[in-house]
């Protein structure tokens, strides 16, 4: 069928000599329905199947009908009957996740129906099999009519991906199936050569009031080549006006370079709350773009996405540079009450291209109501008053992976040194939700928070509440503490990378660290007394006071200089930033042993079962799963695993590199971090890179398997799950050389092949621990013997907490 004929059926008339526009193609793809004359009746004996990588789909019996062709190509079909889907991931992490969600390390599901879209040769493959099985198409209008609503509902979710291959000179075929499993319900099966991990299996599931996308497996096919980076954003020039109603009216010019030829579609991140008014090229010519097509604002908020897809008029050529201009409006500033406002869509308040390792230059001009103060990333060039507005100009002096701003009726305090300026901003009032908590005699406890302290006689100390605290009261001390943390971190990570650090308050229970700009929770600005009145437990108070602000400071190096490009590598920056925050807390309170306290908390957290599951947090999944750890089975999996186990992994590396008795026992660890922060500045740093750098710095004692390899460590502690449990049995005998200790070390809770070096200490009659030596545990039971001068009262496994484990 001629493509023009199809356009006439589904789109406004166009000239017979005109090429279809991107929107006409998209509308035509959306309008496709089943061709009633292309229906095939299948039986088991036909053995109809499709294989994509290591995924196998069998259509055993039922009906299969193709979508009507477009430009002579078939892009989909619908199947109803009985089929079987199989997948066999080889990666141990993916097997573990399959077992976590499905109860087995493979996909083995019977299904009843499937909606399938593709740009590969699936149609040709099926037609060949139909021909070999002597199957002929039949006319079945009833099947087509019954399927039309189903097809109409699902087409829009896939048509843009089909369109992308139509527009490309170098299409990367894909295959997608929405499958109705007998046991699992509806799930997705994707094989896409445009993705680094070509295979994806998963489904959306509800937990509580939230919907999560459970990724059962996502992995690369052996021998596959990752797709190249096609475009790179070089610089951003943005002019943003914050109107009196807090909405934005903004323009952005994004300067882009094509790294490869032949592509036309670019995908930008832009909040669904912002509406793109126009997208144009350098000459003002309009460019086609797609943003939550066919949805109104209310529909966008419920089922939209935060992406804007732009189509170039012609395929880009390698090394070609061009600028795309955007005009957009909407409201991403949230009102928390009591005059407290903050930026909600911090990642997508402007059209952002690329990932966390795509560094670019930024030039920001901001215009905002005169009564407010505004802070932003970059070096501040100037600020002026223009009527009822203030106008400020910021420009990056270092490459940035992202830009941000925040605003409010702030009080501020500054510290200026020879190398940097630290500005801390806070509201004079509390956000309404927190103010309500402080004004309540007994505020509802936050999750996992202890009951507020009560005074004798059963009267709550909140019975006569004092005046509400002001976050601004903490400005001076917080500025000093942040400056101290920077000085501390510079020893490990090198010079502070920015000239200015702006610290801004944000409602909620989290923090974020953008380049030169921190978003810090209001709780971190409160006194311990106010935190207690708000319902925070002692550990949460310590977290907001001693850890959260300084974790975000550490991100100035780890995340904003050393980047990550793949979700599997995000854990590294989070783990290093968090561990450095623990070290800083420990340095401020040496007698409190903060590092040990937090490591014990993290170990306990990893041992505790996830609510609604029989699994402990330590078995949710491996560190490289990143945000996949958040699922219907573990809504807070990322926080429960990344910060706790990630910190332990960095701690174990530090302990293995440590040189007790040296002038600087941490010299090797410091050298490792400094090498990484220099060598990988302003680019992506991966888990494989980390292993390589650790292997370059490793000591002979770390070489448990030979060959100067740390594969054993990364395979078990990074890509593995579980925490080893140890117990010892021993006996002693007296010899001329001293007391000989014979014993066995028992290792459980991990695979039989698990190997690690376990320090053993003798506890003598006086209660002191004396180091005997390290036992390399390479099986469930390992024998050992040591010689000591005094008979041990008992043997103790790792009392110095150098190893993530439990003991008896």
Regions found by a protein language model. Give the residues of each.
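Extended, low-hydrophobicity, Ser/Thr/Pro/Gly-biased non-transmembrane segments
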Residues: 103, 108-230, 234-238, 306-311, ...
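Hydrophobic helix-coil surface modules that form long, contiguous segments used
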Residues: 224-253, 257-264, 269-273, 353-550, ...
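Amphipathic alpha-helical substructures
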Residues: 260, 464-468, 592, 630-632, ...
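Beta-strand-rich binding/interaction modules
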Residues: 264-266, 272-283, 706-710, 721-798
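Acidic/His/Gly-enriched intrinsically disordered linker/tail segments
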Residues: 450-458, 574, 578-652, 680-681
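Zinc-dependent metallopeptidase catalytic helix centered on the HExxH motif
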Residues: 488-490, 536-607, 643, 673
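Edge beta-strands of extracellular beta-sandwich domains
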Residues: 801-808
């Amino acid at each position: 069928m001629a493509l023009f004929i199809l356009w006439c059926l589904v789109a406004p008339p166009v000239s017979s000599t005109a090429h279809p526009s991107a929107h006409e193609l998209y509308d035509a793809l959306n309008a496709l329905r089943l061709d009633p004359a292309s229906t095939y009746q299948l039986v088991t004996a036909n053995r109809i199947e499709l294989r994509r990588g290591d995924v196998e789909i069998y259509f055993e019996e039922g009906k299969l009908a193709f979508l009507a062709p477009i430009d002579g190509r078939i892009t989909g079909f619908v199947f109803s009957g009985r089929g079987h889907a199989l997948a066999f991931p080889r990666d141990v992490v993916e097997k573990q996740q399959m077992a976590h969600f499905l109860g087995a390390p493979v996909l083995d599901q019977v299904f009843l129906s499937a909606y399938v879209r593709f740009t590969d040769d699936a149609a040709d493959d099926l037609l060949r099999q139909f021909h070999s099985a002597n199957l002929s198409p039949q006319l079945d209008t009833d099947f087509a009519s019954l399927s039309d609503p189903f097809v109409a509902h699902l087409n829009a979710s896939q048509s843009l991906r089909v369109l992308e291959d139509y527009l490309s000179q170098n299409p990367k075929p894909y295959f997608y199936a929405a499958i109705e499993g007998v046991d699992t319900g509806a799930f997705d099966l994707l094989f896409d050569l445009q993705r680094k991990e070509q295979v994806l299996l998963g489904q959306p599931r509800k937990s509580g009031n939230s919907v999560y996308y459970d990724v059962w497996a996502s992995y690369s096919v052996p021998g596959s080549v990752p797709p190249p980076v096609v475009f790179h954003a070089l610089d951003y020039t943005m002019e943003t006006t914050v109107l009196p109603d807090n909405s934005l009216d903004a323009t952005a010019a994004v300067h882009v370079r094509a790294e490869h030829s032949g592509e036309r579609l670019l995908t930008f991140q832009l909040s669904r709350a912002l509406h793109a008014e126009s997208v144009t090229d350098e000459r003002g010519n309009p460019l086609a773009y797609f943003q939550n097509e066919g949805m109104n604002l209310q529909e966008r908020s419920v089922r939209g996405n935060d992406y804007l897809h732009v189509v170039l008029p012609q395929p880009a050529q390698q090394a070609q540079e061009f600028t795309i201009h955007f005009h957009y409006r909407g409201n991403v500033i949230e009102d928390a009450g009591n005059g407290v406002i903050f930026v909600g869509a911090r990642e997508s308040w402007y059209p952002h291209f690329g990932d966390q390792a795509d560094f670019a230059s930024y030039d920001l001009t901001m215009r905002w109501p005169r009564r407010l103060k505004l802070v932003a990333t970059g070096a501040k060039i100037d600020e002026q008053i223009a009527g009822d507005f203030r106008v400020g100009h910021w420009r990056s002096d270092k490459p940035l992976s992202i830009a941000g701003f925040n605003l409010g009726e702030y009080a501020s305090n500054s510290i200026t040194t020879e190398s940097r300026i630290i500005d801390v901003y806070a509201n004079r009032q509390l956000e309404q939700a927190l103010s309500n908590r402080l004004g309540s005699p007994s505020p509802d406890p936050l999750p996992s928070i202890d009951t507020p302290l009560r005074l004798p006689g059963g009267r709550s100390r909140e019975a006569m509440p004092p005046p509400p605290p002001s976050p601004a009261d903490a400005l001076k001390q917080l500025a000093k503490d942040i400056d101290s943390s920077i000085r501390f971190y510079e020893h490990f990570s090198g010079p502070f990378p920015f000239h200015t650090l702006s610290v801004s308050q944000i409602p909620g229970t989290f923090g974020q660290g953008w380049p030169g700009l921190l978003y810090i929770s209001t709780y971190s600005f409160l006194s311990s007394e106010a935190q207690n009145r708000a319902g925070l437990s002692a550990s949460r108070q310590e977290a907001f006071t001693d850890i959260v602000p300084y974790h975000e400071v550490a991100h100035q190096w780890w995340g904003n200089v050393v980047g990550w490009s793949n979700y599997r590598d995000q854990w590294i920056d989070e783990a290093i930033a968090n561990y450095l925050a623990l070290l800083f807390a420990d340095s401020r309170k040496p007698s409190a042993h903060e590092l040990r306290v937090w490591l014990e908390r993290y170990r306990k957290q990893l041992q505790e079962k996830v609510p609604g599951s029989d699994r402990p947090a330590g078995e949710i999944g491996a560190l490289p799963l990143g945000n996949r750890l958040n699922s219907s089975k573990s809504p807070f999996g990322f926080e429960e695993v990344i910060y706790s186990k990630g910190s332990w992994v960095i701690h174990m590396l530090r302990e293995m590199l440590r040189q007790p008795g040296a002038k600087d026992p941490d010299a090797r660890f410091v050298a490792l971090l400094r090498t990484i922060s220099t060598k990988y500045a302003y680019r992506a740093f991966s888990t494989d890179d980390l292993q390589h750098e650790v292997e370059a710095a490793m000591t002979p004692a770390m070489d448990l398997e030979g060959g100067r390899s740390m594969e054993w460590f990364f395979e078990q502690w990074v890509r593995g799950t579980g925490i080893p449990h140890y117990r010892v049995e021993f006996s002693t005998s007296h010899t001329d050389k001293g007391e000989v200790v014979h014993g066995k070390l028992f290792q459980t809770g991990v695979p039989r092949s698990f190997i690690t070096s376990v320090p053993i200490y003798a506890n003598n009659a006086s209660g002191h621990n004396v180091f005997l030596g390290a036992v390399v545990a390479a099986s469930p039971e390992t024998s050992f013997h040591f010689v000591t001068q005094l008979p041990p009262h008992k043997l103790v496994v790792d009392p110095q907490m150098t190893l993530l484990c439990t003991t008896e």
